[in-house]
C-alpha cells in the first residue's frame, strides 16, 4: 500500500508516493514507524520475499511535510531512524543527523538520531531522509517528535 504522507525522489530519476514495505528479516522495528520504499514490488524479491525492489547504488530522498503555525516559538525536533543501507536526515534542506559511512553500512540494524532546535520556518516545513542503497532492497523507517510553543 502507499503512504500518502511520504514522497520520494530518486537521484537516478523519478518521484512519487512511498510504498509501505513488508518487513525484511534483517530490518529492525521502530515503534510507530513503518518501513517505506520507492516502488511497487516488481522483481524476484516479490515472489521470494515480497519486501521491496532493489535499486543498486541509488540515493533516494524520502520526505514528509509538516506545518508550524505563525508565531510558533522554541520549535524542536528529535527522532530516530533506520535506513538501508545508510541515511542522513534533513530539516528544510539542512543536515540534522545520520549514519556514519562504514564498509558494512548497517543502517537497517543500527539506528541514527536526528535533532534540530533551529531551521524551522512558519508554515510549511520538510523533514527528509536521504538514503543510500549499496545494493539489494532499500528503505527507511523513522519516528520523530516535533514540539513548539504557540502563543
PLM features: residue spans?
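Accessory carbohydrate-binding/adhesion or oligomerization-edge regions at the termini
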Residues: 1-50, 65-67, 76, 82, ...
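Extracellular beta-rich ligand/substrate-recognition surface
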Residues: 43-61, 99-109
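Extracellular/lumenal carbohydrate-interaction signature centered on repeated Trp-anchored short motifs
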Residues: 55-57, 71, 118-122
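Extended extracellular/luminal ectodomain segments enriched in beta-structured repeat modules
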Residues: 57-60, 68-78
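Surface-exposed beta-strand edges and their flanking turn/coil or helix-capping segments
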Residues: 92, 110-112, 142
Amino acid at each position: 500500500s502507499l503512504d500518502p504522507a511520504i514522497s520520494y525522489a530518486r537521484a537516478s530519476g523519478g518521484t512519487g508516493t512511498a510504498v509501505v514495505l513488508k518487513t525484511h528479516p534483517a530490518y529492525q522495528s521502530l515503534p510507530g514507524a513503518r518501513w517505506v520504499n520507492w516502488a511497487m514490488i516488481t522483481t524476484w524479491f516479490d515472489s521470494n520475499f515480497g519486501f521491496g525492489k532493489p535499486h543498486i547504488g541509488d540515493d533516494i530522498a524520502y520526505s514528509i511535510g509538516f506545518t508550524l503555525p505563525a508565531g510558533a516559538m522554541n520549535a524542536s525536533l528529535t527522532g530516530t531512524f533506520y535506513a538501508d543501507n545508510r541515511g542522513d536526515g534533513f530539516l528544510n534542506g539542512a543536515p540534522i543527523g545520520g549514519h556514519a559511512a562504514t564498509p558494512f553500512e548497517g543502517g537497517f540494524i543500527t539506528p541514527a538520531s536526528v535533532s534540530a532546535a533551529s531551521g524551522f520556518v512558519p508554515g510549511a516545513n520538510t523533514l527528509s531522509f536521504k538514503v543510500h542503497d549499496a545494493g539489494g532492497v532499500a528503505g527507511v523507517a523513522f519516528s520523530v517528535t516535533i514540539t513548539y510553543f504557540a502563543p
